[in-house]
């Protein structure tokens, strides 16, 4: 029997609708992967929860599956890169290792009223100045506050000194290291609405505002650093966890967007357009978020790379709703052909505000809507309208980025599961009037985490050489339909105005 001497990097990509483990070889190529769909819990309208135990159990099972399928052991794996859905958070008991409540997901709207109370007290501007974020239920702070109130009421005898808080990266790190490491990185911490974007530390005034004890919060580390090692008994050996990133930041890194002005858009559960703004915070005048792309130690000094982001909450989620909610389709993949069976939407416009509206509207009270229905409208028209709405949202954010930067975007790099829809990508190119570039390997999130971990550990020492292995899969150029598509955008904006402020 021959011994496998190849060296690998393991990427863990823990998303909103599913979790994935991908093994990359020493050339930076994907050689194996495992995937598990994640259960979604909707206890009340506008609420969404995940079972953190399921996330951990799936993570562990996927690692085992990848090792079994490839014959690779922990001794072959140089490092683990971890990337996660952001903002989703939980509390757990460090004594038992059990979550105290299901994790509250980033799409969850239960704390909208708390945000409105804080806005009425004039706290929104302070929060934006300190964190770069708008005051919204999207971020972790109000979710952690709600969870703490629930624990105090439902478990009054629990000693809060035993309670730990964290986003999904923190939870999985804690489990991977056998409870030895309670940490996060700056890219994930910057999405909690509790980290000061200038000092790069927890902001005590904001912790006090949301009544969250600092000792519950994880230590913040550079994104590209050694967070600890996996517990030997778990994986048959200790593997360094050498990078932790938010999912959108990991995708930005995979695309090679390491210079100011470079950007990408991920089409996943939501759509997220991020533009690198360099080593200084750029404040948006157009309702974009100022956030951390990643951090690293350079000659012993902490260096932050900042970004502007437009977060759109509902992309794959509205296609999933077509399948699971109203059962108009049997599979996500068939939406492309169904949309192409009709010339247009027959006057139908869809507003994808199933979890409110994100950038650039930031309307927690908006709700989804289908407008323009007449007797001649068919299933295919509605499906096409849903896909078109995804492109319309992205155009709003691209327009905002262009205004903030003063430099029109020349092309758009894309990734994520929904970017496989050729109809949508062509429609997006027509709408923006610029080429849309999709890589051959679309799991950019996992790839970015792998690249970061391999560079941190020294398996690779040339980022640009790694990127040169990335092949362009397809470029969608604007075609003769561009003018008609852009006219539809104006009508869609009218539909959005009808759906805004719906429940207030």
Curated annotation (Swiss-Prot):
<feature type="binding site">
    <location>
        <position position="87"/>
    </location>
    <ligand>
        <name>glycerol</name>
    </ligand>
</feature>
<feature type="binding site">
    <location>
        <position position="316"/>
    </location>
    <ligand>
        <name>ADP</name>
    </ligand>
</feature>
<feature type="binding site">
    <location>
        <position position="20"/>
    </location>
    <ligand>
        <name>ADP</name>
    </ligand>
</feature>
<keyword id="KW-0067">ATP-binding</keyword>
<keyword id="KW-0418">Kinase</keyword>
<feature type="binding site">
    <location>
        <position position="87"/>
    </location>
    <ligand>
        <name>sn-glycerol 3-phosphate</name>
    </ligand>
</feature>
<feature type="binding site">
    <location>
        <position position="269"/>
    </location>
    <ligand>
        <name>ADP</name>
    </ligand>
</feature>
<dbReference type="InterPro" id="IPR043129">
    <property type="entry name" value="ATPase_NBD"/>
</dbReference>
<dbReference type="InterPro" id="IPR005999">
    <property type="entry name" value="Glycerol_kin"/>
</dbReference>
<feature type="binding site">
    <location>
        <position position="138"/>
    </location>
    <ligand>
        <name>sn-glycerol 3-phosphate</name>
    </ligand>
</feature>
<comment type="function">
    <text>Key enzyme in the regulation of glycerol uptake and metabolism. Catalyzes the phosphorylation of glycerol to yield sn-glycerol 3-phosphate.</text>
</comment>
<feature type="binding site">
    <location>
        <position position="269"/>
    </location>
    <ligand>
        <name>ATP</name>
    </ligand>
</feature>
<feature type="binding site">
    <location>
        <position position="248"/>
    </location>
    <ligand>
        <name>glycerol</name>
    </ligand>
</feature>
<feature type="binding site">
    <location>
        <position position="86"/>
    </location>
    <ligand>
        <name>glycerol</name>
    </ligand>
</feature>
<feature type="binding site">
    <location>
        <position position="417"/>
    </location>
    <ligand>
        <name>ADP</name>
    </ligand>
</feature>
<feature type="binding site">
    <location>
        <position position="86"/>
    </location>
    <ligand>
        <name>sn-glycerol 3-phosphate</name>
    </ligand>
</feature>
<feature type="binding site">
    <location>
        <position position="138"/>
    </location>
    <ligand>
        <name>glycerol</name>
    </ligand>
</feature>
<feature type="binding site">
    <location>
        <position position="17"/>
    </location>
    <ligand>
        <name>ATP</name>
    </ligand>
</feature>
<dbReference type="InterPro" id="IPR000577">
    <property type="entry name" value="Carb_kinase_FGGY"/>
</dbReference>
<feature type="binding site">
    <location>
        <position position="316"/>
    </location>
    <ligand>
        <name>ATP</name>
    </ligand>
</feature>
<keyword id="KW-0547">Nucleotide-binding</keyword>
<feature type="binding site">
    <location>
        <position position="320"/>
    </location>
    <ligand>
        <name>ATP</name>
    </ligand>
</feature>
<dbReference type="GO" id="GO:0005524">
    <property type="term" value="F:ATP binding"/>
</dbReference>
<protein>
    <recommendedName>
        <fullName>Glycerol kinase</fullName>
        <ecNumber>2.7.1.30</ecNumber>
    </recommendedName>
</protein>
<dbReference type="GO" id="GO:0019563">
    <property type="term" value="P:glycerol catabolic process"/>
</dbReference>
<dbReference type="GO" id="GO:0006071">
    <property type="term" value="P:glycerol metabolic process"/>
</dbReference>
<dbReference type="InterPro" id="IPR018483">
    <property type="entry name" value="Carb_kinase_FGGY_CS"/>
</dbReference>
<dbReference type="InterPro" id="IPR018485">
    <property type="entry name" value="FGGY_C"/>
</dbReference>
<keyword id="KW-0319">Glycerol metabolism</keyword>
<comment type="similarity">
    <text>Belongs to the FGGY kinase family.</text>
</comment>
<dbReference type="InterPro" id="IPR018484">
    <property type="entry name" value="FGGY_N"/>
</dbReference>
<feature type="binding site">
    <location>
        <position position="16"/>
    </location>
    <ligand>
        <name>sn-glycerol 3-phosphate</name>
    </ligand>
</feature>
<feature type="binding site">
    <location>
        <position position="247"/>
    </location>
    <ligand>
        <name>sn-glycerol 3-phosphate</name>
    </ligand>
</feature>
<keyword id="KW-0808">Transferase</keyword>
<feature type="binding site">
    <location>
        <position position="421"/>
    </location>
    <ligand>
        <name>ADP</name>
    </ligand>
</feature>
<feature type="binding site">
    <location>
        <position position="417"/>
    </location>
    <ligand>
        <name>ATP</name>
    </ligand>
</feature>
<feature type="binding site">
    <location>
        <position position="247"/>
    </location>
    <ligand>
        <name>glycerol</name>
    </ligand>
</feature>
<feature type="binding site">
    <location>
        <position position="16"/>
    </location>
    <ligand>
        <name>ADP</name>
    </ligand>
</feature>
<dbReference type="Pfam" id="PF00370">
    <property type="entry name" value="FGGY_N"/>
</dbReference>
<dbReference type="Pfam" id="PF02782">
    <property type="entry name" value="FGGY_C"/>
</dbReference>
<feature type="binding site">
    <location>
        <position position="16"/>
    </location>
    <ligand>
        <name>ATP</name>
    </ligand>
</feature>
<comment type="pathway">
    <text>Polyol metabolism; glycerol degradation via glycerol kinase pathway; sn-glycerol 3-phosphate from glycerol: step 1/1.</text>
</comment>
